[in-house]
Amino acid sequence: MAQQPLLSLPEFQSVSTGTLVVKEPLNFWGGARVKPRDTKNSEPVYEPATGRVLCDMIPCGEEEVDQAIKSAHSAYLKWSQLSGMERSRIMLEAARIIRERRNAIAKAEVANNGKSITEAEVDIDVAWQCIEYYAGIAPTLSGQHIQLPGGSFAYTRREPLGVCVGIGAWNYPFQIAAWKSAPALACGNAMVFKPSPMTPVTAVMLAEIYKEAGVPDGLFNVVQGGAETGSLLCHHPMVAKVSFTGSVPTGKKVMEMAAKSVKQVTLELGGKSPLIIFKDCELENAIKGALMANFLTQGEVCCNGTRVFVQREIMPKFLEEVVKRTKAISVGDPLCEGTRMGALISKPHMEKVLGFIKQAKEQGGKVLCGGERFVPNDPKLKDGYFVSPCVLDNCRDDMTCVKEEIFGPVMSVLPFDTEEEVLQRANNTTFGLASGVFTRDIARAHRVAANLQAGTCYINNYNVGPVEVPFGGYKMSGFGRENGTVTIEYYSQLKTVVVEMGDVESLF
């Protein structure tokens, strides 16, 4: 009897906060969900908004990882032989299905991740747009012709890598799975994807959608697990590439493991990004930009501009307005349309964020608003992982809250006087994922962008990420890129073919 996709099961038809319980197996390879072999290492997965158990995450062992990778390799042998146009048609169908089921996927994402439904729906839109974008690129993949003397010539072929591994993060579970799989599949690869153990659900929905759209069974597989499962994936001899999104310490381990068999690696790691607001800015836009740079997804965004440098002359007005609007942010049930901030991913993470705020106060910082555990009025949310959005003043560059990634709804505001000074301070970090500048001076805007040591610089906006635009970091924020046409280079390899049209000239 054929399996019902997760999205067609009754429990996913009318998701509301505190109601969803997932009992289906969440591994997927060979075109179907696969029951785990061993449940002894099962870990509970919690619904962030309520603190109740949503499902169990049962990690894959060595035999299961091997099965998933071999299934992917078999599918790769078929998929890579299709034309780009044939691959494109199937990917466009997957994008259409996601678009059609946007709301149901978004609700499942909210239950597992805790972000507001408003944001989750945008995430799902970005996912189908990404797949649609790379579906458009698939038929255009081509090489180059090089004319050589005597009528000889050479040409290049852009070829797939084989089986790629994607390791996702818990802040954008479905979107990251799409970001990694879409360019991989467009190039003719297969992918085995490991979601975060805290958000195991929606990547399986993507796998089922790809199957429904017509990809060969095994082309996009999902294995559940934590560090041990990730290690098995990185060490497997049939894996050609690993794309990882997550923390710097784990990224270093991924790179080390991949190096043993010289696998290609893309790393999208942490950040402590600067947002520089000059006194000549359009202040209203700068305030909105600062809020967008700090409070999306409860502050759990790697590229957030959490070090907000404000030119001293406008600091009082900026703080007054930012605090007023931060206090007005609606925190609560993430499935309610009016909610603008949901729950943090887990209780330990919530406690870590609150610990950063406590330490900031001990180091001289001043909490202008928020920074406390928030308990909504709704009784079912009393055990949720909510934190009121926080603005910190009196911050210094040497404070922990300014140097380390908090990954929560905490904005650290710092004054500055000159462009030269703020650039030096902004670049004084081991991270280099993103940056931003607000100014009306077009020359200054481009000068500052050129001098900021980061993979992305936003001018007069922040946290805008169209799928057409490459995204990735400098320094310890990683390397490689996601999105944009350049990502094709990270999921393919170039073969040079040299053709002699005359006789061989030999020295021997």
Swiss-Prot record:
It holds the Pfam family Aldedh. It catalyses: 4-(trimethylamino)butanal + NAD(+) + H2O = 4-(trimethylamino)butanoate + NADH + 2 H(+); an aldehyde + NAD(+) + H2O = a carboxylate + NADH + 2 H(+). The keyword Ion transport does not apply. Keywords: Cytoplasm, NAD, Oxidoreductase. It is an enzyme of class 1 (oxidoreductase). One of its GO terms (molecular function) is 4-trimethylammoniobutyraldehyde dehydrogenase activity. One of its GO terms (biological process) is aldehyde metabolic process. One of its GO terms (cellular component) is cytosol. The active site is at E268 (proton acceptor), C302 (nucleophile). InterPro entries: Ald_DH/histidinol_DH, Ald_DH_C, Ald_DH_CS_CYS, Ald_DH_CS_GLU, Ald_DH_N, Aldehyde_DH_dom. PROSITE patterns: ALDEHYDE_DEHYDR_CYS (PS00070), ALDEHYDE_DEHYDR_GLU (PS00687). Its EC number is 1.2.1.47, 1.2.1.3. NAD(+) binds at K194, G246, S247, V248, P249, T250, E405. It is found in: Cytoplasm, Cytosol. Belongs to the aldehyde dehydrogenase family. NCBIfam families: PRK13252.1. Converts gamma-trimethylaminobutyraldehyde into gamma-butyrobetaine with high efficiency (in vitro). Can catalyze the irreversible oxidation of a broad range of aldehydes to the corresponding acids in an NAD-dependent reaction, but with low efficiency. This is 4-trimethylaminobutyraldehyde dehydrogenase A. It comes from Danio rerio. The lineage of its organism: Eukaryota, Metazoa, Chordata, Craniata, Vertebrata.
